[in-house]
Amino acid sequence: MTSSNLIKQLQERGLVAQVTDEDALAERLAQGPISLYCGFDPTADSLHLGHLVPLLCLKRFQLAGHRPVALVGGATGMIGDPSFKASERKLNTEDTVNEWVEKIRHQVSPFLDFDCGENSAIAANNYDWFGGMNVLTFLRDIGKHFSVNQMINKEAVKQRLNRDDSGISFTEFSYNLLQAYDFACLNKNHGVALQIGGSDQWGNITSGIDLTRRLHQQQVYGLTVPLITKADGTKFGKTEGGAVWLDPKKTSPYKFYQFWINTADADVYRFLKFFTFMSLEEINALEEEDKNSGKAPRAQYVLAENVTGMVHGPEGLAAAKRITESLFSGDLHDMTEADFAQLAQDGMPTVELNRDADLQQALVNAELVPSRGQARTMIGSNAVAINGEKQADPEYVFTDADRLFGRYTLLRRGKKHYCLISWL
């Protein structure tokens, strides 16, 4: 992406929900590099897919020559953003928040270049300026610039005030002031002139623009990326097991890869624009190729490879592909012990069994059949495989050779029903 028409390029990819004073921002970007920031509050010990679009937007700006600031909210994470939340957030302890700050800082770092000259990325923590601030300073220097009338009319706050079952505490009500002051501080300390964030952050961003103008007489800008939705109306970034996390210990690279492989045809080309750095020409050519091939589309695999490689690196991508191909072919010889651990983590149903369990009992415990009698029938009809090999003996007893790495056995009933045994 080039700096001269960066906003237009982002719009062509569907990455702009709202922007303040678009013409003035476009003109400012055309004049030369700026500093911009995006904030990430430590409300959990990992970022999730919802954070990926704004994080990648920071990267897009850096690739165009601008300087990104990744702000982790060590202070705001102690409060919790009420924007469009149905109820009060749970307040976490300071130790917990500090631990999460470090984890999120570590997650953000690989996406940005912190050693590339004048536009090297900066990592910041808003606890640095809020940690030593007393309440009188907060009220005198920040609070006096805010009208309560305007604050309660912000859509994110109005929704909470209008709920019969939940109002809003002064703690969360004050969050808007904290995020606004972040913008003013970063403007003063690093010359930050643009804040980007999710579309739910619009009210907080515009407050920061107003406060920066009042405190420093600087014109600054805001840009939000859209809330990602799926064509069928269901939430993006969720599975039956909950959120899809960027931390491989919470969502394994295999499950992460499978999430993208299962993208609907109606969504995949749009998601390629959101989540990859492929050019629009490349994406359009891929769509045309898929349309005319008469085969299953390639786009899902291109998307899965791009995003998994970006988030989990070459080794994580290789493991995800290796597991996928092994399960598809039934040949498990290329799988490593770590690959089986990914399956046990979240890749498929897993059951722990004592080593004296026979095949019939294993099928019942794995919930692949309802009874030992049904297990006998399934085994006898050649519908059961152990580690990819069919087993037709109803009286079969497992041997050490079935326990891969001394610990794992993969059962399959039919073509699609799997369970991983973890032997005790």
Curated annotation (Swiss-Prot):
Keyword line: Aminoacyl-tRNA synthetase, ATP-binding, Cytoplasm, Ligase, Nucleotide-binding, Protein biosynthesis, RNA-binding
Name of the top EC class for this enzyme: ligase
Amino acids binding ATP: K238
Residues reported in the UniProt entry to bind L-tyrosine: Y37, Y175, Q179
The reaction(s) this protein catalyses: tRNA(Tyr) + L-tyrosine + ATP = L-tyrosyl-tRNA(Tyr) + AMP + diphosphate + H(+)
Pfam families in alphabetical order: SYY_C-terminal, tRNA-synt_1b
Motif position, 'KMSKS' region: 235-239
EC number per UniProt: 6.1.1.1
Motif 'HIGH' region: where in chain: 42-51
SMART domains: S4
Gene3D superfamilies, alphabetized: HUPs, RNA-binding S4 domain, Tyrosyl-Transfer RNA Synthetase
GO cellular-component term (any): cytosol
Residue ranges occupied by any S4 RNA-binding domain in the UniProt entry: 357-414
BP GO annotations: tyrosyl-tRNA aminoacylation
MF-aspect GO terms: ATP binding; RNA binding; tyrosine-tRNA ligase activity
Domain of life per record: Bacteria
Subcellular location: Cytoplasm
Assembly information from the UniProt record: Homodimer.
HAMAP family per UniProt: Tyr_tRNA_synth_type1
Function: Catalyzes the attachment of tyrosine to tRNA(Tyr) in a two-step reaction: tyrosine is first activated by ATP to form Tyr-AMP and then transferred to the acceptor end of tRNA(Tyr).
Annotated family: Belongs to the class-I aminoacyl-tRNA synthetase family. TyrS type 1 subfamily.
PANTHER family xref list: TYROSINE--TRNA LIGASE, MITOCHONDRIAL, TYROSYL-TRNA SYNTHETASE
Protein name stated in the entry: Tyrosine--tRNA ligase
Species name: Yersinia pseudotuberculosis serotype O:1b (strain IP 31758)
